[in-house]
Amino acid sequence: MKTKYMLIPLLCALSACSSTETDTSVPEIIPVGEATAPLNCQEYPRGGAIFFDYLFRDDTELGAYNIEIHNNFDHHTHSTEAGECRQDPAKEPVNPWILNKDYPIPAGNTSFEAKLTIPVPADVDPGEYHFMIRLTDRSGWQQLKSVSIRVTDPV
């Protein structure tokens, strides 16, 4: 009888074992040639649109991505791009553009081209903004790409 009860935990332990493969690499955010947008220092008019186009890759499986846009009127930084964009004097926001949205990636993908049309609200404060892309793989590894963009008055 004791053997029977000792066998149950052993079977549970053995069946719970998984592959020894461990995902230790972060996913990649890759520009798509001429189509890539946004890029550092690009300008977008209020009431216009950002045509987002990036390729995401991972060695095992992609998870999801997030787009965040927030003002940079105080000149803080977390850009992952080399080079500085033209800066206006620091200012207080009145009606800043704030966007923070998650997007799923279909299960099983190791490569995914993300294409979105992101409308620029017509009533937001013009000025400097950060456009951040967060890409997470199924294991939880995350890659961040942050570029500076400028919202302008329409011509």
PLM regions with names:
Residues P9-L10, V120:
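Exposed boundary/loop context
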Residues A13-A16:
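C-terminal motif of bacterial Sec signal peptides marking the signal peptidase cleavage site
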Residues D23-S25:
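N-terminal helix-cap/turn-to-beta initiation motif at the start of protein domains
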Residues P27-V155:
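First exposed extracellular module after export/assembly in secreted or surface-exposed proteins
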Residues S18-E21:
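Bacterial signal peptide processing site
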Residues K2-P9:
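Sec-dependent signal peptide recognition
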